[in-house]
């Protein structure tokens, strides 16, 4: 080759390589491919923040084998490898469930929600990662666990795109088995239960093994969740099975001590009901489990409809003892935590879900004593405690509307606030705890007829401000003040994922729950509060238990006679 032509040849090759690189980069930017331990997966590019910021979404990645056939009522197993490139551009099927939630949300928001298929084959996760992220980026990772009373919900309920793009973090949203498929227990080796919790552990193992390929740092993982998702996060904090799988925890309107989501016994309280509803004439637990494994998805759904909640159990493995015992004995992972509640946890949605909304509306001074007595029994309290509850929450009030409001306050404290405070006080001596009460009344609740005007922050209302979008990623119309609240909450949550501390320059200061029991009132103008519900905490943790012991002592003496 003549020497005078060599530079042209080299120039042509360089141009060709440049064009090839541009072409490959262009392909990657629209249709990214990432490696996992079990195969390659193709995602998609989505734009957020007025279409100027790109996020890669990888949807429906399997983190376990389909829990079907012999794997029904069994611990999850690692996923099978696949050849070729798996499509990760469409939402995964949600786990089998009775869909209580969607009609309620549609009515309240005045929106039409997308249809998502349902299957027992549902152990998948979604990943949202900034488009610039690559292996070695070492971005903080936040793993979202959806709520839904352990009977409903899905990974796709909350879209992590905007949070990932705004705060330059990796968001993972996981699914887990629900209802009886997720939590049925016979109390012995044939079906120990907590299958849904074991799914969550499996998902966290998958994150440790694979998230680096998506730009995440496996050594900087924060788990967060709402309602039953918060209960799940809190349960993972006390479970020996999750050691080393995460480094921070955020419990939003749910902790491991929520009364309806944990059973005191290894055998679930509803096991006889399952046996009866299933039509399984089984002589023992082994035969019952075998019979239930033979049921179709439709038959399982029919059994599920009986239950509005399915509690976890003390199985000796995921939960060696009751969460309260584990917390009291400091047998938990001492990771930094954010724990919080909404100001009107039982303002509307929870009573509606529990079928109590019409009953509450009919409360008067005359009907209240009998109603409180029946609720005390449901709360696993001696019926005689109803007088004490009446005295503490209602006093001499006669006005029906005030009585109804005070009953909702009682429900809120019993179900959410007191359990959250107890967990926070157990943990704060061993790791930083930041507590909040979300107080803002959202402007985007369209159907004011569906939700009473007196409700400020109902159960789960804060979630839209964490993700910057409504359910299923639907855009929300925020006021200018709400946009600032949204920006601040995203920053608090992301700061915590980065540093184990929500604070940074430019944000209202959020103190630890140490001096003067300080917490943050999350509203348009955040403010520091002190000793949230201190009197009620004393009532539920000191006065009421003492009264119960006195009643038991009196009953014991009576039985001796």
UniProtKB/Swiss-Prot annotation:
One of its GO terms (cellular component) is endoplasmic reticulum lumen. InterPro entries: AB_hydrolase_fold, CarbesteraseB, Carboxylesterase_B_AS, Carboxylesterase_B_CS, Type-B_Carboxylest/Lipase. CDD domains: Esterase_lipase. It is found in: Endoplasmic reticulum lumen. It catalyses: a carboxylic ester + H2O = an alcohol + a carboxylate + H(+). One of its GO terms (molecular function) is carboxylesterase activity. Glycans are attached at residues 276, 362. Disulfide bonds join 95-122, 280-291. Involved in the detoxification of xenobiotics and in the activation of ester and amide prodrugs. This is Liver carboxylesterase.
């Amino acid at each position: 080759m003549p020497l005078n032509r060599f530079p042209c040849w080299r120039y042509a090759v360089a141009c060709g390589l440049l064009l090839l690189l541009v072409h490959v980069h262009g392909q990657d930017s629209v249709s990214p491919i990432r490696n996992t331990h079990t195969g390659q997966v193709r995602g998609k590019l989505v734009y957020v923040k007025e279409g100027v910021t790109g996020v890669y979404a990888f949807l429906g990645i399997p983190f376990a084998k389909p829990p079907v056939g012999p794997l029904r009522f069994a611990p999850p197993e690692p996923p099978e490898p696949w050849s070729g490139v798996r499509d990760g551009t469409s939402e995964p099927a949600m786990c089998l469930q009775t869909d209580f939630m969607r009609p309620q949300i549609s009515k309240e928001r005045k929106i039409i929600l997308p249809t998502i298929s349902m299957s027992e084959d549902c152990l998948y996760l979604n990943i949202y990662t900034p488009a610039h992220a690559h292996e070695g980026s070492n971005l903080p990772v936040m793993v979202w666990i959806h709520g839904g009373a352990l009977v409903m919900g899905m990974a796709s309920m909350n879209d992590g795109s905007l949070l990932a793009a705004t705060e330059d973090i990796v968001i993972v949203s996981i699914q887990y088995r629900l209802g009886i498929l997720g939590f049925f227990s016979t109390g012995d080796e044939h079906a120990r239960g907590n299958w849904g919790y074991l799914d969550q552990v499996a998902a966290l193992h998958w994150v440790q093994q694979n998230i680096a390929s998506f730009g995440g740092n496996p050594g900087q993982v924060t788990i967060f969740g709402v309602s039953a998702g918060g209960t799940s996060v809190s349960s993972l904090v006390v479970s020996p099975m999750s050691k080393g799988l995460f480094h921070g925890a955020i419990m939003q309107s749910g902790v491991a001590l929520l009364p309806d989501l944990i059973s005191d016994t290894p055998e679930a309280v509803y096991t006889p009901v399952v046996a009866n509803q299933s039509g399984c004439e089984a002589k023992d637990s082994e035969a019952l489990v075998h019979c239930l494994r033979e049921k179709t998805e439709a038959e399982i759904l029919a059994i599920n409809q009986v239950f509005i909640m399915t509690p976890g159990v003390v199985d000796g493995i995921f939960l060696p003892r009751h969460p309260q015992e584990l917390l009291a004995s400091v047998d938990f992972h001492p990771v930094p935590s954010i724990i919080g509640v909404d100001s009107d946890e039982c303002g509307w949605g929870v009573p509606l879900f529990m079928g109590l909304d019409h009953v509450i509306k009919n409360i008067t001074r005359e009907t209240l004593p009998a109603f409180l007595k029946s609720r005390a029994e449901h709360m696993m309290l001696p019926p005689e405690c109803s007088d004490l509850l009446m005295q503490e929450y209602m006093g001499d009030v006669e006005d029906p509307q005030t009585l109804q409001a005070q009953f909702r306050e009682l429900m809120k404290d019993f179900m959410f606030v007191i359990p959250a405070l107890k967990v926070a006080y157990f943990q704060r001596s061993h790791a930083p705890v930041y507590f909040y009460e979300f107080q803002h009344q959202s402007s985007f609740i369209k159907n004011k007829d569906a939700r009473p005007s007196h409700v400020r922050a109902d159960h789960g209302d804060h979630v839209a401000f964490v993700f910057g979008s409504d359910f299923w990623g639907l855009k929300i119309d925020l006021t200018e003040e709400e946009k600032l609240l949204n920006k601040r909450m995203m920053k608090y949550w992301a700061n915590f994922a980065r540093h184990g501390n929500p604070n940074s320059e430019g944000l209202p200061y959020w103190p630890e729950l140490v001096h003067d029991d300080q917490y943050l009132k999350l509203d348009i103008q955040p403010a520091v509060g002190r000793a949230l519900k201190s009197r009620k905490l004393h009532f539920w943790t000191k006065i009421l238990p003492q009264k119960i012991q006195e009643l038991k002592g009196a009953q014991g003496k009576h039985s001796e006679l």
